[in-house]
Amino acid sequence: MEYFGEFLGKYLFYIWLGLAILLFTFLITRGKKVLKQFVDIDFNKIVYSEKNASGHVVRQTQTRRAGTTKMLHIIITDQELIFKTNLFFAHIAHENDMLHRIPLGNIMQTEFKKGRFSSKLYVKFRTIHGDEKVVILQSKNNLRMQSILEQYI
């Protein structure tokens, strides 16, 4: 047992560093794979864009508790509503069902709710597979986003 303690004391930093590099590499490679769906965004047709928003999907028990906090990039083009995030957190956002490309014609309803400390925008939409989802967004300009999205409902 003494030998294990000496070994751990001597090599703990290198073990920790190796695990950190493995985790970092995993998140980057998975993030690149997940973000391939956003490669062809035409940035000349952006109507609205906001970084550092928060949100979560209300569909399953697991995703009600999980979401993204201050890492969501919301983009509205003339044809799509896009939720994406940066490379490092893309895998986590994908696992929490927060990466979407929604044609504006698939948006069914938006609802603005003013809270005590912040406001929330509920966006109900139909996925490509026909499922209905609701995303709750917390951003700086929820009313502006709602007015843009209401034009397409």
Residue ranges and their predicted role:
Residues F125-I148:
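Canonical phosphoinositide-binding patch of PH/PH-like domains
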Residues M71, E95-L99, G130-V134:
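Short, mixed charged/polar active-site loops
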Residues H56, T63-R64, I82-F83, F89-I92, ...:
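Short, surface-exposed beta-strand/loop "edge" segments at domain boundaries and coil↔beta transitions
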Residues I46, A53-G55, K140-L143, I148-Y152:
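Eukaryotic phosphoinositide-binding membrane-targeting regions
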Residues A66, D78-Y122:
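Phosphoinositide-binding peripheral membrane targeting modules
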Residues M71-I75, H100, V123, L137:
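Hydrophobic/aromatic beta-strand elements that line small-molecule binding cavities or substrate pockets
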